[in-house]
């Protein structure tokens, strides 16, 4: 049996809920992470809102004095250590969360950097996404996230997205 114990996957939960335990996105991310874990992949799920992250396409928002704390450089190191990056987002008004956009902007700040071989930093890494919500837009959100990841250098495999969508409007969410 093939195992993938030489791979590391980072799942970024871009829920707009501060409490990770209340996040429906986290619950679906956990299912995807469980599949990878069962195949030997080293898996980590990070709840983005548990960290202080400055805005803008900057590597460290403390360098210009606009913020006294920015946890992004540490998150970026975790991204760089991962072979696989999965961005999880809820759908709000048919769009990905503002937290997922913040993650993409911060990653983009590194997109011009090169590794020791002269390749873009994200070269050779794979990305995917998980989308949850009670309204239409899974494919549109996935398209935006996956295009951004491809644009900065990630490889996007076939069927790189999954999602759960309930009936439009108020009602049960994924974890209910």
Functional labels for PLM-detected ranges:
Residues 1-117:
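N-terminal beta1-alpha1-beta2 submodule of the flavodoxin-like/Rossmannoid cofactor-binding fold
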Residues 1-3, 155-176:
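C-terminal and late-domain segments of enzyme folds
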Residues 18-22, 131, 176:
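Active-site oxyanion-binding pockets that recognize sulfate/phosphate
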Residues 35, 62, 105-106, 112, ...:
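Alpha-helix boundary/capping detector
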Residues 57, 92-93, 136, 173-176:
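A general structural signal for short secondary-structure boundary/capping elements
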Residues 71-82, 119-122, 144-153, 170-175:
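Short, surface-exposed, charge-dense and proline/glycine-enriched linear segments
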Residues 116-166:
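Short, glycine-/small-residue-rich phosphate/pyrophosphate-handling segment
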């Amino acid at each position: 049996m093939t195992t993938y114990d030489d791979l590391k996957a980072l799942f970024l939960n871009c829920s707009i809920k501060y409490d990770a335990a209340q996040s429906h996105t986290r619950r679906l991310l956990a299912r995807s992470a469980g599949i990878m874990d069962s195949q030997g992949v080293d898996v980590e799920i990070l709840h983005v809102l548990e960290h202080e992250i400055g805005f803008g396409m900057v590597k460290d928002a403390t360098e210009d004095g606009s913020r006294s704390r920015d946890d992004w450089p540490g998150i970026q190191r975790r991204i760089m250590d991962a072979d696989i990056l999965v961005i999880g987002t809820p759908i709000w008004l048919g769009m990905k969360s503002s937290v997922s956009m913040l993650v993409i902007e911060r990653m983009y700040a590194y997109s011009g950097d090169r590794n020791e071989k002269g390749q873009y930093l994200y070269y050779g890494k794979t990305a995917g996404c998980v989308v949850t919500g009670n309204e239409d837009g899974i494919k549109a959100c996935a398209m935006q996230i996956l295009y951004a990841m491809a644009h900065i250098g990630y490889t996007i495999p076939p069927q790189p997205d999954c999602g759960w969508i309930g009936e439009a409007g108020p009602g049960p969410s994924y974890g209910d």
